[in-house]
């Protein structure tokens, strides 16, 4: 009997999906694979991934959680998404979305856009005044999303650096004790902030949640929602800024187009979101569990089966995107990528993330037209120990 392909697949590249993932995608949309905890179905093609993302028969929670091997960081992530309990997921996750979706209103996003653009201008001013080489990650990619999510939550300026460091530590899979301790620091801080805002409300998400449901939401529950916004509201944007810069530097013709015409920034952002997935040690997978039988092609996924949705592979599926590997700002009416998911679990903060990325890429190469890596790309270190991956350093000259 042939041995099943084993996840995670080896991926020597900083950008892009694993070669084995590409090979499996060519063979068909669904294949049985082995993971650390259990066997699973791997879905690699665009149409099937999109359909399953919106299929209510798939859920976050495992009906037999004791069999699945999960890091402490992943357990924390599942709990924040109300996906750690099979019996409660169907009610708790929709309730979370019902409370949080209005917090990302058009009015608030309009206000946030002006503030984000100001943050980007200030960070680029500081970067341009520095002596090269400069760490772009520390100067721009990390502080911007941290500022933005702290603006949303009403976190005081003095607390933002430590909040960002705690949040990063929470998703560290290499040290369970550190992950637990930093997450507890985030929870404790959020509880204190909620209690402070009960007497000193502001124009922020926590203050609005305190007033929601006639003030009946508990401090603990509001703090839980605040932790979810914080932890999911900035880490992936940090990674995408870094990877977007690398994509631009790899594609000088597209970079020149953007520098000449900043109106192409939204198109650049969509290509970054589509292609800046994967990376060394990452397969860009969304784990789900079948809550009832599902048929994909001629294969039946049985109730309780684990399913891995390969977002990175779906986003470079040649059936959906002509010349899918090309970074191309001139794509005409491209299909929607799935960097933010799809369907009932579509990322709540996707509009905000797009605003942040657009503000960065409208400005970065106009302000720093000679921006280049200060080290060979292959020397950049992908953080395999972090759930979201990414880099801790991007040295550049300008």
Swiss-Prot record:
Specify the domain of life of the species encoding this protein: Bacteria
Which pathway does it operate in? Antibiotic biosynthesis; pentalenolactone biosynthesis
Relate the protein's function as given in its record: Catalyzes the final step in the biosynthesis of the sesquiterpenoid antibiotic pentalenolactone by mediating the oxidative rearrangement of pentalenolactone F to pentalenolactone.
Q: Where does heme bind?
A: 347
Q: Which gene encodes it?
A: penM
- The record's EC number reads 1.14.19.8
Q: Does the keyword field hold DNA repair? A: no
- Protein's name according to its UniProt entry: Pentalenolactone synthase
């Amino acid at each position: 009997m042939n041995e099943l392909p084993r996840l995670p697949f080896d991926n020597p590249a900083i950008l892009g999906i694993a070669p084995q993932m590409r090979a499996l995608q060519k063979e068909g949309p669904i294949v049985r694979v082995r993971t650390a905890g259990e066997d699973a179905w791997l879905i690699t093609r665009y149409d099937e991934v999109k359909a399953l993302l919106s299929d209510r028969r798939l859920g976050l929670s495992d009906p037999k959680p004791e069999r699945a091997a999960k890091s402490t960081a992943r357990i924390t992530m599942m709990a924040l998404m109300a996906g750690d309990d099979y019996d409660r997921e169907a009610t708790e996750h929709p309730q979370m979305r019902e409370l949080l979706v209005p917090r990302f209103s058009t009015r608030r996003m309009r206000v946030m856009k002006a503030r984000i653009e100001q943050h980007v201008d200030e960070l680029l001013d500081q970067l341009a005044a520095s002596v090269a080489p400069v760490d772009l990650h520390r100067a721009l990619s990390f502080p911007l999303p941290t500022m933005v999510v702290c603006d949303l939550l009403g976190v005081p300026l003095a607390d933002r650096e430590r909040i960002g460091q705690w949040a990063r530590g929470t998703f560290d899979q290499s040290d369970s004790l550190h992950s637990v301790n930093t997450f507890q620091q985030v929870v404790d801080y959020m509880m204190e902030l909620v209690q402070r805002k009960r007497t000193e409300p502001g124009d922020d998400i926590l203050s609005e949640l305190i007033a929601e449901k006639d003030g009946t939401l508990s401090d603990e529950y509001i703090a839980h929602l605040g932790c979810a916004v914080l932890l999911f509201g900035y880490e992936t944007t940090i990674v995408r800024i870094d990877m977007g810069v690398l994509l631009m530097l790899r594609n000088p013709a597209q970079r020149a187009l953007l520098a000449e015409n900043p109106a192409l920034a939204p198109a650049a952002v969509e290509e970054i979101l589509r292609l800046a997935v994967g990376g060394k040690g990452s397969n860009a997978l969304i784990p789900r569990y079948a809550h009832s039988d599902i048929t994909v092609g001629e294969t039946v996924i049985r109730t309780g089966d684990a399913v891995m949705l390969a977002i990175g592979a779906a986003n470079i599926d040649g059936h959906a995107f002509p010349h899918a590997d090309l970074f191309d700002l001139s794509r005409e009416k491209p299909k929607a990528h799935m960097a933010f998911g799809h369907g009932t679990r579509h990322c709540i903060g996707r509009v905000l993330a797009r605003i942040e990325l657009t503000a960065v890429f409208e400005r970065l190469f106009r302000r720093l037209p000679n921006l280049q890596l200060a080290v060979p790309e292959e020397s950049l270190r992908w953080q395999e120990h972090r759930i979201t991956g990414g880099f801790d350093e991007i040295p550049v000259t300008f």
